[in-house]
């Protein structure tokens, strides 16, 4: 089967999709005009063993380049993980142990090949070249930058101004990451917007070492399901790529409508023309839950399989008797009004999921009240900031948020 060929304009359109910044687009065009596979690099420190959808924004961009016929280098920073990336941190980040790095790194390849073509991806570890680097070589590398240049970085400058300690090894991180681009002779490096300084460091160092400078492309940090903070396990606003199909389905259908376009742009592989048509349908009155369902099924098929995608709604919390999540799930916001928490009886009454307190207590006693698919007792409560899906009886349901 002959692989599709892309015009320069088609390549640029796909590369620009979801990209925050391209430094510089003029250089990128020059490289694309060479009509040879470009060496595309993205580095990942194995700081956590499991990926969520926020991590896949960058991997999806690698997939775009892969589909265009370019060479993909998925760099696992096992060496740099021993330093600890200070990007965006207001304090020194503790380095990982060799055992932690090995355990975390082992899970990466398996997960990324849910997206990337294994046969067309080179997985490399930066310990391959750094383990053989001498102290003299490292000092030589450090000589290519100044302390004043390092302090131009936002997080370093803030810590310096507030007299928060900055360890010398943290200054090495951008240099070491930059040297990765030299070792791989990268044409393009991808990273999150929090990595701009480090990506540009690689571009600068390539020039100092006599190489053609890489193009730097940043992608946005994806908001989590709360629509405010970045997707993070610690904030419990994430969708894990290993989440069960029903869990993934329910989480994605719970996202705010304001995130639909961004999630499609960054997470879906549907052509943007098709995405724009879906957005237009929603503006014309199509239920947003139906649009979310389309995205949920695409992602579940990618990370599980087509059968799981077709049946995910049946295990998504059993909100209705047949397992189908309603597309018009009512949303209710409740106020604490000076209380530390709201108990389930109060919640059922205030959310109009029960006729009265007696009815609420009776349903709870009969095990007819479920929160996110789990039966709860009278001791269940919600505190500020929590959002859940509640089913009371066979047909009463609501998405409840406590302020």
From Swiss-Prot:
Presence of the UniProt keyword Hydrolase in the record: no
GO terms for biological process, alphabetical: tyrosyl-tRNA aminoacylation
Keywords: Aminoacyl-tRNA synthetase, ATP-binding, Cytoplasm, Ligase, Nucleotide-binding, Protein biosynthesis, RNA-binding
Keyword Protein biosynthesis: yes
EC class: ligase
Record domain S4 RNA-binding: where: 342-402
Main location: cytoplasm
UniProt short sequence motif 'HIGH' region, positions renumbered to this chain: 46-55
Locations listed in the record: Cytoplasm
SUPFAM superfamilies in the cross-refs: Alpha-L RNA-binding motif (SSF55174), Nucleotidylyl transferase (SSF52374)
Record note on quaternary structure: Homodimer.
NCBIfam families hit by this protein: tyrS
Name used for this protein in its record: Tyrosine--tRNA ligase
Organism: Psychrobacter arcticus (strain DSM 17307 / VKM B-2377 / 273-4)
Lineage: Bacteria, Pseudomonadati, Pseudomonadota, Gammaproteobacteria, Moraxellales
